[in-house]
Amino acid sequence: SPVDKTFLARYREXN
């Protein structure tokens, strides 16, 4: 799931 990966990546980066 590309969307999930992007969401997780952004969430982790943001955090």
Curated annotation (Swiss-Prot):
It comes from the Eukaryota. One of its GO terms (cellular component) is extracellular region. Its main location: secreted. It is found in: Secreted, Cell wall. Keywords: Cell wall, Secreted. This is 68 kDa cell wall protein. It comes from Nicotiana tabacum.
